[in-house]
């Protein structure tokens, strides 16, 4: 179930970002929609708290400093997106940095918050603390418990 009003207008929107220009377009679309309908906007940035498979196979583990740095980077990305949304007129915007694989993090927040719309970009970028958004749309589309908006973000 979702928190959608009886009119079908979303009241709670979750959007994912990795800080890339393409993800910024998805956040901008979600923010514009939230502002237009007065919906709450929750911005999520996921970060990896586990060693990549090659590193783990070599018996190397991540220290708490690396995980803290990844969390801080994801939190900064989400916070900056939230500040832009608020500056653009979104009355109720919040942000979260969530440990885990991006599609799982987005699904979990969507479920936990009883959101009625999840917004993702069609493509993204990958770097040390940010994760590819391209496959996320595919992964969440099969399991999302609410409406899904995939924003065309090709350059």
Where in the sequence are the language-model features?
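Structural beta-alpha unit
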Residues: 1-9, 83-118, 155
């Amino acid at each position: 179930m979702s928190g959608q009003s009886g009119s079908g207008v979303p009241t709670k929107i979750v959007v994912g970002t990795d800080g890339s220009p393409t993800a910024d377009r998805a956040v901008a679309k979600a923010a514009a929609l939230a502002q237009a309908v007065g919906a709450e906007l929750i911005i999520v940035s996921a970060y990896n708290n586990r060693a990549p498979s090659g590193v783990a196979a070599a018996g190397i583990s991540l220290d708490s400093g690396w995980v803290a740095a990844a969390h801080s980077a994801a939190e900064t990305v989400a916070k900056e997106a939230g500040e832009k949304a608020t500056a653009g007129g979104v009355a109720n915007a919040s942000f979260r940095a969530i440990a885990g694989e991006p599609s799982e993090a987005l699904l979990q927040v969507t479920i936990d918050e009883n959101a009625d719309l999840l917004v993702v970009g069609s493509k993204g970028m990958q770097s040390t603390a940010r994760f590819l958004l391209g496959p996320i749309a595919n992964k969440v589309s099969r399991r999302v418990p609410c409406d899904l908006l995939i924003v065309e973000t090709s350059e």
